[in-house]
Amino acid sequence: RAANRVVGNVAQGLGVDSACLEVAYGGLTLEALQPAVIAVTGADALVEVLTAQGRRYAVNTYAPLALDAGDRLSVNTPQAGSRNYVAVRGGWSVAPVLGSASTDTLARVGPAALAAGDALQVGSAAGLPPVALAEQAAFAMPRADEEICLDVVLGPRTDWFDQQSLELLCSQAWAVTPQSNRVGIRLQGD
């Protein structure tokens, strides 16, 4: 929601729930095909712009950024946190499935997952309020070398775990593996 607030996606039915691109663990590069105002929020990651003229510079997260046609935006691997969110003024034009623009790869529900080379349409920014000057992160993201304690909330697949498995889950340290995605986090135990 912060990314949408920064770019002014709060009027004419766009709301702060306009679709954002969710970037897990960095590695995203976008090229603007037309002038656009975007914002990147979330994890503490180096975000850079390579202009169409070849100039490279770092940009702040939680702030509006004007891109010209041909500019490339890169979101690198986060130093803290794991996910970034990219909003565009006017919103990403994506047809919702069951009221959501999210892709659930496990359930195979939602719009098709993005792939390299995809072109995304941008909605109209007509009538939107001015962009925000900047936002602040809601909290400090944990760094990759920090150990954090999480609450366990059992969900609809509780029957997949016996009592011994639940006790093991709560009694040791776990590391997040690269096989994680927006549907779930794969853990490696001791």
What are these regions (language model features)?
Residues 1-190:
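Conserved "landmark" site that anchors the functional core of diverse proteins
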